[in-house]
Amino acid sequence: MRTISAQQITDTVARLCIEANTRLPRDVQEALDKARAEEPWPLAKNTLDLLWSNLAAAKEENLPICQDTGMACVFVELGTDVHIDGSFEAAIHEGVRRGYTCLLYTSRCV
């Protein structure tokens, strides 16, 4: 049997909330880079450049990519031979709360 502390779950969920709001998946970033390189219209290219600058700033400063960070929905796959040391649900809620409030994210849904 494997034991996981509720604190580990909280820390992981908080980290993932921050990552999800400050970084794009690689394939999306590559698509944006490709669109910037291939865009012939100057106004559209400027818009793509602004998006890219915003993404770079978000990553460097650990800020949300967008001011509306949405509402977290956590999906968990948990094996049958795992014991959680503490409250599983409370650990997830606390991780989301920390992830969204430690960097002054919107608190509408926290």
Each model region followed by its residue ranges:
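Charge-biased, low-complexity intrinsically disordered regions
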Residues: M1-E60, V76-A91, V96-T101
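Conserved small/polar residues in nucleotide/adenosyl-binding loops
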Residues: Y105-V110
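Conserved phosphate/anionic-ligand binding catalytic regions in large, soluble enzymes, centered on
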Residues: E61-V76
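Hydrophobic transmembrane alpha-helix bundles
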Residues: C66-Q67, Y100-L104
